[in-house]
Amino acid sequence: HLESSAALARARIERAHAGLERAGRVLVVGAGDVGVELVGEITSAFPGAGVTLLEACARILPNRGYLPELRRSIADQLERRGVEVITGDTLAWLPPVDPGVLSPFRVTTTKGRRLEADTWFRAHGASAATGFLGEDYDEIRHYDGTIRVDEHLRVVGHPGVWAIGDITDVRETKRADAARAHAR
């Protein structure tokens, strides 16, 4: 099963890459860590593609923990790359095509703005992939998939089991450097 999942993921990545090579405009929905990073990658690898970055919150990188100076710097970089940044608005409905598939479409935001793109990516609403842990962990699994840990990162109710990184319910921005700090 894991091999087939890996093959499927590889095929989707290859399809998205091929689509990005031909896309005139790309829509990225979500301007948090993942969305901003994705836009940076797209504008670097495919400089001919126009990019629209749509964020429901009033600012990019809406998660707490970012200094205003960093947000301004990122916004300036996005502007220099020609990215159209729209904040405080959401899609009225999802595009009629799967994310990462090249197929021109039009959508409207809840504020009535019409957007056109050739492909799109969803970069919001992440949840921790903890389903593989099974039913033994259901009582300590939150709605977003994270699991309860104590101050020493021990999994609550499971002696001898620790967790680090994105699957923990530690209140922090989920980043690789935080997972490395957990491991120490």
Language-model features and meaning:
Residues 1-45:
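Glycine-rich dinucleotide-binding loop and its adjacent helix/turn
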Residues 5-24, 114-182:
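FAD-site-proximal beta/loop scaffold in flavoenzymes
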Residues 31, 56, 166:
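Cofactor-binding loop segments of dinucleotide-utilizing enzymes, especially the Rossmann-like FAD-
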Residues 36, 60-61, 155, 171:
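Catalytic P-loop NTPase motifs of RecA-like helicase/translocase cores
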Residues 37, 55, 182:
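Acidic donor-binding helix in nucleotide-sugar-dependent glycosyltransferases
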Residues 41-49, 178-184:
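Short, electropositive alpha-helical surface patch
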Residues 47-151:
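A Rossmann-like FAD-binding core segment of flavoenzymes
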